[in-house]
């Protein structure tokens, strides 16, 4: 939740600054999320690998994997930073107004500075969650948020008394970069001072003689799992973020309304995502300890809890959607554009919760290739491809109620439902096969 609060702070502040800045935020966020989440997926392979090693009691080997994840994060940050500094492909897809483009570029420049810190912290987060220390992550993320909020307010709205101009969406990008590096330095200090990390020999821990040199065997193992994981996450995220890029063609008001609905969906997603991380960690640890029966039980229990909570949260937002949207904007046109999209969130969120839990339990078993195929078919094929055809009436058959942004949300919900059903059935097959073995 602390992670998505960064985006929520930006959305609320920018929505009250100008619709043009909100449109820039929607396209810029879509570009950054596409780059960051796709790269972060490769780093996330650290979680199930360390979880199984920790469950087997191989602490030094688990720590060695963290050193390799740092090298991987730095290399990926260089690649991703180039895409953010030179965002022409994203701008070409969005076809935004000329007045919006400079603001997108300025916002992404700040996020390019934030990207190395974000990927390094992803490695820190993956390790801590894998060894059942989520509080260490939560505290630092809340500290980053505490730095982010006042910085965003000052830089986005300005402080005339101090001669600081209102930078709008660009100021939010700068604030994110500062806050992310604060998190990384705080994480390094914690690794250095807390005795828990010493037996692992992780970077910065007491007694560790610096960063281990690249171990290409370990890096290959991480990439073998991380690449399909990263691609699967990239498919899911681009299916959502490219909605914003295509909806931007409709104008600033439709994309501003979409940004509000998208931020709500992302906020709701944080609960099943957190539960999925926790469930995946416990399942991986039980697999490492060779207790497959308990691993199966934990996986199914996690899915049941995620669906129950998703029903309550999604239903609550649906019933209170008018009041929720009013918290984001006082622009009646933007609110009118957002409300029909927010109405889809109940079914969207239920499917999202089911698919992410099933995918994470499969990752605990080090299975990522089949989920990638399912994601590509359901989310790119049905969600994004179908959404484009419906929203822009490619075949001349779209009813008026589904033209524009509503068509994208209709198709994306259908794609998520298909992904959820397919992943859950595949998980059932995997568990039955393990039981038979």
Q: Which stretches of residues belong to each language-model region?
A:
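Transmembrane helical elements of multi-pass membrane transporters/channels
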Residues: 1-10, 110, 114, 121, ...
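Helix-terminus/linker motif at the lipid-water interface of multi-pass membrane proteins
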Residues: 4-23, 91-98, 154-167, 230, ...
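Alpha-helical transmembrane segments of multipass membrane proteins
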Residues: 8-12, 89, 123-127, 149-157, ...
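Membrane-helix boundary and inter-helical linker elements of multi-pass secondary transporters
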Residues: 15, 52-55, 130, 165, ...
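Small-residue hotspots at the loop-to-helix junctions and early N-terminal turns
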Residues: 19-30, 104-108, 173, 252-267, ...
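Small-residue-rich hydrophobic transmembrane alpha-helices
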Residues: 22-81, 85, 121-132, 137, ...
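Short runs within selected transmembrane alpha-helices of multi-pass transporters and secretion channels
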Residues: 43, 47, 111-129, 137-145, ...
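Short alpha-helical transmembrane segments in multi-pass integral membrane proteins
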Residues: 50-116, 150, 154-227, 283-348, ...
């Amino acid at each position: 939740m602390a992670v998505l609060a960064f985006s929520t702070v930006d959305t609320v502040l920018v929505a009250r600054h100008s619709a043009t800045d909100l449109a820039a935020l929607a396209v810029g966020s879509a570009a950054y999320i596409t780059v960051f989440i796709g790269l972060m997926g490769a780093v996330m392979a650290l979680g199930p690998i360390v979880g199984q090693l920790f469950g087997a009691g191989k602490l030094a080997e688990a720590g060695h994997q963290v050193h390799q994840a740092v090298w991987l994060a730095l290399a990926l940050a260089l690649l991703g930073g180039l895409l953010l500094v030179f965002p022409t492909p994203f701008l070409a897809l969005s076809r935004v107004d000329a007045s919006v483009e400079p603001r997108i570029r300025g916002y992404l420049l700040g996020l390019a500075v934030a990207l190395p810190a974000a990927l390094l912290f992803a490695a820190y987060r993956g390790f801590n969650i894998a060894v059942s220390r989520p509080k260490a992550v939560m505290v630092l993320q809340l500290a980053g948020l505490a730095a982010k909020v006042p910085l965003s307010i000052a830089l986005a709205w300005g402080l005339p008394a101090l001669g600081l101009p209102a930078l709008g969406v660009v100021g939010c990008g700068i604030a994110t970069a500062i806050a992310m590096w604060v998190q990384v330095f705080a994480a390094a200090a914690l690794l250095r001072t807390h005795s828990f990390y010493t037996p692992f020999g992780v970077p910065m821990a007491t007694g560790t003689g610096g960063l281990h040199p690249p171990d290409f065997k370990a890096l290959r193992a991480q990439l073998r799992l991380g690449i399909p994981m990263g691609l699967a996450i990239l498919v899911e995220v681009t299916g959502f973020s490219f909605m914003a890029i295509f909806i931007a063609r409709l104008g600033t008001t439709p994309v501003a309304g979409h940004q509000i609905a998208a931020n709500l969906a992302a906020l709701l997603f944080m609960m099943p995502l957190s539960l999925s991380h926790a469930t995946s960690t416990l399942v991986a640890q039980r697999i490492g300890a060779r207790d497959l029966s308990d691993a199966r039980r934990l996986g199914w229990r996690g899915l049941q809890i995620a669906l129950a909570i998703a029903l309550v949260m999604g239903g609550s937002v649906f019933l209170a959607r008018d009041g929720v949207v009013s918290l984001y904007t006082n622009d009646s046109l933007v609110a009118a554009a957002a409300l029909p999209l927010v109405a889809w969130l109940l079914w969207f969120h239920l499917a999202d919760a089911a698919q992410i839990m099933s995918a994470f339990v499969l990752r605990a078993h080090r299975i990522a290739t089949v989920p990638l195929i399912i994601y590509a078919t359901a989310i790119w094929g049905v969600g994004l491809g179908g959404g484009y055809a419906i929203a822009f009436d490619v075949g001349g058959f779209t009813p008026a109620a589904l033209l524009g942004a509503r068509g994208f949300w209709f198709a994306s919900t259908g794609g998520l439902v298909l992904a959820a059903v397919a992943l859950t059935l595949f998980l059932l097959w995997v568990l039955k096969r393990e039981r038979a073995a």
